[in-house]
Amino acid sequence: MAVQKNVIKGILAGTFALMLSGCVTVPDAIKGSSPTPQQDLVRVMSAPQLYVGQEARFGGKVVAVQNQQGKTRLEIATVPLDSGARPTLGEPSRGRIYADVNGFLDPVDFRGQLVTVVGPITGAVDGKIGNTPYKFMVMQVTGYKRWHLTQQVIMPPQPIDPWFYGGRGWPYGYGGWGWYNPGPARVQTVVTE
């Protein structure tokens, strides 16, 4: 009886550890101090003065980089963030923001890159996208994370049956012991640290 309890405890502990390993966490650099930073740009832009001073977290693609006296201004085309605060690929832009970072950031290292920024909202300013007037939300960045794109090969699911012999007609058709035609693999682009 005691052996059974120990086995069950071991299985439960292993299952719990496996479940925890699948959890996605926000990197420390962009955690911020608020448990729920503002992430809805449409809501913020409807009344930006109400959100001044509140912590926000936005991410997307850096469209432009302006080096100014003592700071760098990133123009970011924002997209929704996933549970790990990574920009979601393939989503349309929700709008643009200016993210002011203290110090110098080299435009070569940031233009066209995916980033997530966190910090207090400082207001909204008028600007332009091309020749079109646009109102940008502005935030003071207290932390940022630059992301990388990686391609992964995704194989189709394999049969689970260890005694799977192959297609109908074996051994006269295709296959033999353990043969399985998985079909084409697909290449998927993912955002990684």
Swiss-Prot record:
Organism name: Escherichia coli (strain K12)
Name of the featured protein: Uncharacterized lipoprotein YeaY
PANTHER family per the UniProt record, alphabetical: OUTER MEMBRANE PROTEIN SLP
One Pfam family here: Slp
InterPro entries with a match to the protein in the record: OMP_Slp
Record's subcellular location: Cell membrane
Lipid positions (N-palmitoyl cysteine): C23
UniProt keyword annotations, A-Z: Cell membrane, Lipoprotein, Membrane, Palmitate, Signal
Bilayer topology annotation: Lipid-anchor
GO cellular component: outer membrane; plasma membrane
Signal peptide (UniProt feature, chain positions): 1-22
Lipidation (S-diacylglycerol cysteine): C23
